[in-house]
Swiss-Prot record:
One of its GO terms (cellular component) is delta DNA polymerase complex. Heterodimer with subunits of 125 kDa and 50 kDa. The gene is POLD2. Its main location: nucleus. It is an enzyme of class 2 (transferase). Keywords: DNA replication, DNA-directed DNA polymerase, Nucleotidyltransferase, Nucleus, Transferase. It catalyses: DNA(n) + a 2'-deoxyribonucleoside 5'-triphosphate = DNA(n+1) + diphosphate. This is DNA polymerase delta small subunit.
């Protein structure tokens, strides 16, 4: 009698190291401080960097402060950009037009042909002119060095621009001989009408090795880590009104959390998983968002493989550095600047060395007093952004040989797509679990 013996696949192991400490708000105390201090900290750190790059960029030119500009004299100035936007919403306008018959227009993008840029340092500010610096590309909060001269009109005519560029990168390990994968997904939106429980369950079954034939299970065994990049929940807005809820409404609110916890406990039983907060999740609104409370996940939190993380989130897997957000930083850039694709926005933040340049101007963030945690000091190998409309990826190379895989993760509830990143070569591909359910 023949006995069929099924091959047992052992999941590959990896070393994990969280780097979220700089995004955690622990010792900070809010004493009514304003946001000027985070801008000052950003300018101080970035100016030191740009000063060090200036001699190799324009060694023959002096570096001046805005207050020290002389008409017609070429020089370099370093400062923070401010973008004057005609269509940018204003709180005062909202109050003044509250009773007006004219509706407040809320366009998807607030760009206007008359927008202009201003450079500011601690000594003063100057309006910028010339075509070398496009208002369509830059936003308020970016620190740059500019080569140019002051005109008779009192403007600074820009002839060239120096950005910080990609930061130094830790060396990729050369001893990775086998394929190992990190799976990235976002926008589960459990509780929404667009959420499909079958899609997520198929993904969970694939990750845990309960789906497919022997070859499929062998591929699943190569998954060593899972990251859920925000917007895991969607609650009924009518119930979130600050009022006491009836027991039935409380149960309705808790249902999406309970459903996600069941799914996460299945994943955590077989592989390590990180969950990041997003715009719609029960976490603080301002960046950096703090980890979702572990009491929300009574089934998952007992596993040491389950981690509730910050947004932004940074970590190493087998010395491959990952950095990512749940998408708020890129979505905000899309409102106040233009690009051919979301990946262009992602690449710009990396070359500006700042995760969220529009914070705190148009993107909420904590008023740090002595540091700016969004500065990118070390170049990641993988830089991902969650909750985008579609999947996209790009491999970029820095001037010092840095290689970075940029990834836009689509909303899983709308696309049924997750992204698998190979640690060995930084190649990535999609895992598609799109299904059709008849609502008739």
């Amino acid at each position: 009698m023949e006995i069929d013996s099924e091959k047992i696949h052992e999941r590959k192991q990896s070393d994990y190291n969280s780097l979220d400490e700089r995004f955690e708000i622990q010792k900070e105390m809010y004493r009514g401080q304003q946001y000027s201090q985070i801008y000052f900290a950003r300018l101080h750190l970035m100016r030191t960097l740009l000063y060090s790059l200036a001699p190799t960029w324009k060694s023959h030119l002096p570096v001046c402060k805005v207050l020290g500009l002389e008409k017609g004299k070429e020089c370099i100035i370093v400062g923070t950009l401010f973008k004057h936007m005609k269509l940018k919403p204003c709180v005062l306008d909202e109050y003044s037009k509250e009773r007006s018959v004219t509706p407040l227009v809320k366009p998807h993008n607030f760009m206007h042909p008359d927008d202009n840029l201003i450079l500011e340092d601690e000594s003063g500010r100057v309006k910028l002119a010339g075509s070398a610096l496009s208002p369509a590309i830059y936003v308020t909060g970016v620190v740059v060095a500019l080569h140019g001269k002051e005109t008779n009109a009192g403007e600074f005519f820009v002839e060239d621009v120096l950005e910080a560029g990609l930061p130094p990168q830790i060396e990729r390990p050369i001893d990775l001989q086998e394929d190992k994968y990190v799976v990235l997904l976002s926008g589960l939106c459990i509780g929404s009408k667009s959420a499909n429980p079958l899609q997520f369950q198929l993904l969970v079954d694939h990750i845990t090795g309960h789906l497919g034939d022997e070859e499929e299970q062998g591929l699943a065994a190569q998954i060593v880590h899972v990251v859920i990049a925000g917007n895991s929940f969607e609650f009924p807005r009518k119930l979130i009104n600050g009022q006491n809820l009836a027991s039935k409404d409380q149960s309705t609110l808790y249902e999406p959390i309970k459903e996600l916890d069941i799914m996460l406990s299945q994943i955590a039983a077989g592989v390590s998983v990180d969950i990041m907060p997003g715009t719609n999740d029960p976490a603080n609104f301002a960046l950096p968002q703090q980890p979702l409370n572990r009491c929300l996940f009574p089934g998952s939190s007992p596993y040491n493989t389950f981690r509730s993380c910050t947004n932004p989130h940074s970590f190493d897997v087998d010395n491959i550095r990952f950095l990512g957000t749940s998408g708020q930083n890129i979505d905000d850039l899309g409102k106040y600047s233009e690009a051919k694709s979301k990946l262009d926005f992602v690449e710009r933040t990396l070359r500006w060395r700042h995760l969220a340049p529009t914070a705190p101007n148009t993107l909420g963030c904590y008023p740090f007093t002595d540091r700016d945690p969004f500065l990118i000091e070390t170049c990641p190998h993988v830089y991902f952004v969650g909750n985008q409309d579609k999947y996209d990826n790009r491999l970029i190379k820095g001037s010092e040989g840095q290689l970075v895989r940029l990834i836009c993760i689509p909303k899983f509830c709308e696309t049924g797509i997750a992204v698998a990143v190979n640690l060995r070569n930084l190649e990535c591909h999609t895992l598609s679990f799109s299904t059709q359910i008849n609502q008739s």
